[in-house]
């Protein structure tokens, strides 16, 4: 049985709750001692993992809609992507304000150079910013065929974000490996589009180098 438009609306409500409740829990944990011995790192990892979860959920929607024959599921993809961007922004903000501090934000540029995993993270965030800004139907009409080309960069984020996570942890644990494995699986399900994106990037790099 296919989902109805009303059921998809209720599903969106549930997804909004899924995006909001972790934030409410985080606020509670900060104020009631629910974090570990290094609360700053806990906040950074929690916000980053939540962003990654929404990224993976966003990538899951298209193959799930196809294989389950639920075309209306596509309507939830933008919502999931926006929650991914929101949590990625919280992740970046927590690093800038809690790790560096308000008085040391000028060091962010130096940090990006000396810590390559931060470079991957900021590249991912910039891509997500562009995707969030152009996610409306009005922008889709304005960009035309270029809209899909731009939004295919989500597959690049799906590679960079897990690497950023793996690189940032001092001790390799199963959790970042699981996220990386899920990202690889979802990219495999979208093999044609991800291959098209990387072939185009390779050609652009080759053309610039040959100039």
Curated annotation (Swiss-Prot):
Keywords from the UniProt entry: Cell inner membrane, Cell membrane, Electron transport, Flavoprotein, FMN, Heme, Iron, Membrane, Metal-binding, Transmembrane, Transmembrane helix, Transport
Gene Ontology molecular function, alphabetical: electron transfer activity; FMN binding; heme binding; metal ion binding; oxidoreductase activity, acting on diphenols and related substances as donors
Biological process annotations from GO: protein repair
Gene Ontology CC: one annotated term: plasma membrane
Topology versus the membrane: Multi-pass membrane protein
Free-text remark on how the cofactor is bound: Binds 1 FMN per subunit. Binds 1 heme b (iron(II)-protoporphyrin IX) group per subunit.
Record keyword Ubl conjugation present: no
Source species, domain of life: Bacteria
Cofactor(s) needed for function: FMN; heme b
Transmembrane regions listed in the UniProt entry: 10-30, 82-102, 116-136, 153-173
Subcellular compartments: Cell inner membrane
Description of how the protein assembles with itself and partners: Heterodimer of a catalytic subunit (MsrP) and a heme-binding subunit (MsrQ).
Purpose of the protein: Part of the MsrPQ system that repairs oxidized periplasmic proteins containing methionine sulfoxide residues (Met-O), using respiratory chain electrons. Thus protects these proteins from oxidative-stress damage caused by reactive species of oxygen and chlorine generated by the host defense mechanisms. MsrPQ is essential for the maintenance of envelope integrity under bleach stress, rescuing a wide series of structurally unrelated periplasmic proteins from methionine oxidation, including the primary periplasmic chaperone SurA and the lipoprotein Pal.
HAMAP family: MsrQ
Family: Belongs to the MsrQ family.
Protein name: Protein-methionine-sulfoxide reductase heme-binding subunit MsrQ
Taxonomic lineage: Bacteria, Pseudomonadati, Pseudomonadota, Gammaproteobacteria, Enterobacterales
